[in-house]
Amino acid sequence: MNTLLEHSCDVLIIGSGAAGLSLALRLADQHQVIVLSKGPVTEGSTFYAQGGIAAVFDETDSIDSHVEDTLIAGAGICDRHAVEFVASNARSCVQWLIDQGVLFDTHIQPNGEESYHLTREGGHSHRRILHAADATGREVETTLVSKALNHPNIRVLERSNAVDLIISDKIGLPGTRRVVGAWVWNRNKEKVETCHAKAVVLATGGASKVYQYTTNPDISSGDGIAMAWRAGCRVANLEFNQFHPTALYHPQARNFLLTEALRGEGAYLKRPDGTRFMPDFDVRGELAPRDIVARAIDHEMKRLGADCMFLDISHKPADFIRQHFPMIYEKLLGLGIDLTQEPVPIVPAAHYTCGGVMVDDHGRTDVEGLYAIGEVSYTGLHGANRMASNSLLECLVYGWSAAEDITRRMPYAHDISTLPPWDESRVENPDERVIIQHNWHELRLFMWDYVGIVRTTKRLERALRRITMLQQEIDEYYAHFRVSNNLLELRNLVQVAELIVRCAMMRKESRGLHFTLDYPELLTHSGPSILSPGNHYINR
């Protein structure tokens, strides 16, 4: 039995960060758009991004330099075409953001002219990071949200989780296999609704919540990667999860990130005894790429048996620190730490998913009509390690590129008037919610211990056995009980955990963010780790 559609649009965008909202605004003058947000519309990784956006605005810088820096940080397996595509379109996409009203910091040059204040971060050979103090993501997100909420062709559905994608062949529709919409969990009504769309875009962010310690907000549960996999899309390079070197080590602020820009402006990493250690690991010192810095911190913590290392910028003038890092300064002061006077305790934490759903230059996946942009996707830009401040840039460039392709294809898109309703005829209300909570904590703990910064084959095998057991329990629970937010996220996280481990087991080398004691050397020839649904394989 089919039902009239509860929601219908030209384009359904799942996710409300920089990728999803920039795409929505580019499409909305010509198309009807629905944006799903799991929580409040501003909640997501974009809002919490501190550093900035990389683009060539300085006349002493060049696109070629941006490309080469990205390739070096990516440890030899970036897709050069993707890197050149993003770097060459960076300035125009950042300019679009400025045209929307985003205010980046400026300063007065010695000649009296005003220009953007550009910072330098790890891996960059030039100052090319546009920023809004130390809260760039907040400035970007609040500006885009304001524009989206006031656009007549954009509907934002808050507290709405995508349960799964609706694929044509799975509901008996003839013709080319394509996405026709999604089932959506309305958390306010506690019911699953149907949403038809001529095109669906995954802009759901990454999967760092699969780890016990993360800088990401709670919504980063790998939903888009898991849904795309279940829909039949390939994924790639999920073994490369970036651990940000400097998350605050404090019981009252476990998810708080200390931006790369602190080290870009001269902060040192120190042992508990006050000595620096980064020069022992890399000639670039504190400005080495994140994978090297995170491993160095992890090494020193384990070698010394220390709970944390320290980040120290107190040798810089206090006014300079307060001017450039006002949000961090106030946050730390509220926790009893004076950034201008003392070192800050830090630990690495899961931060960014460098792999994801395989896409082309326009964000197209393996399923007709389905796109993936931003952190959920694998474009080839990041390779084995993302360079600082390339993530928001990737959101903007592929938001633009996907909008061009969707608009070009929209006249030929299929339209339908009914979809099958969500079937709850054989499920009941859950009676043991503790099962979800227990499995949730178990998953995140063993992923941190076995599939973290340093790995071994035995640890990966042990993790995969645990994942298989959890999947059986969760699948049984999902089949018999009504859905909930925690169940949906756990189901997706366990699926992504499996994909991460399988990718990691395929890579018989240590490269970038994937470091294994069993294969500490680099292979001479390497490439992306690609998984295909129903036929796990590697393609190098």
Curated annotation (Swiss-Prot):
**Binding of FAD, residues:** 16-19, 38, 45-52, 223, 375, 391-392
Q: Where in the cell is it found?
A: Cytoplasm
Keyword check for Cytoplasm? yes
Keyword Oxidoreductase listed? The answer is: yes
Gene3D superfamilies associated with the record: FAD/NAD(P)-binding domain (3.50.50.60), Fumarate reductase/succinate dehydrogenase flavoprotein-like, C-terminal domain (1.20.58.100), Succinate dehydrogenase/fumarate reductase flavoprotein, catalytic domain (3.90.700.10)
Where is the catalytic site?
Answer: R290
Enzyme class, broadest EC rank: oxidoreductase
EC number(s) from the headed UniProt entry = 1.4.3.16, 1.5.99.-
Pathway involvement? Cofactor biosynthesis; NAD(+) biosynthesis; iminoaspartate from L-aspartate (oxidase route): step 1/1
Spell out the SUPFAM superfamilies in the cross-references: FAD/NAD(P)-binding domain (SSF51905), Succinate dehydrogenase/fumarate reductase flavoprotein C-terminal domain (SSF46977), Succinate dehydrogenase/fumarate reductase flavoprotein, catalytic domain (SSF56425)
Q: In the record's cofactor note, how is the cofactor described as bound?
A: Binds 1 FAD per subunit.
List the InterPro entries.
FAD-dep_OxRdtase_2_FAD-bd, FAD/NAD-bd_sf, Fum_R/Succ_DH_flav-like_C_sf, Fum_Rdtase/Succ_DH_flav-like_C, NadB, Succ_DH/fumarate_Rdtase_cat_sf
Pfam families recorded: FAD_binding_2, Succ_DH_flav_C
Residues at the site labelled Important in orienting the L-aspartate substrate: E121
Q: Which GO terms describe its cellular component?
A: cytoplasm
Cofactor names from the entry are:
FAD
**Record keywords, A-Z:** Cytoplasm, FAD, Flavoprotein, Nucleotide-binding, Oxidoreductase, Pyridine nucleotide biosynthesis
Tell me what reaction this enzyme catalyses. Answer: L-aspartate + O2 = iminosuccinate + H2O2; fumarate + L-aspartate = iminosuccinate + succinate
MF terms in GO? L-aspartate oxidase activity; nucleotide binding
In Gene Ontology terms, what is a biological process of this protein?
'de novo' NAD biosynthetic process from L-aspartate
Q: What does this protein do?
A: Catalyzes the oxidation of L-aspartate to iminoaspartate, the first step in the de novo biosynthesis of NAD(+). Can use either oxygen or fumarate as electron acceptors, which allows the enzyme to be functional under aerobic and anaerobic conditions.
Q: Which family does it belong to?
A: Belongs to the FAD-dependent oxidoreductase 2 family. NadB subfamily.
Entries under PANTHER family matching the protein: L-ASPARTATE OXIDASE (PTHR42716), L-ASPARTATE OXIDASE, CHLOROPLASTIC (PTHR42716:SF2)
Name the UniProt record assigns to this protein: L-aspartate oxidase
Give the organism the record lists. Answer: Escherichia coli O157:H7
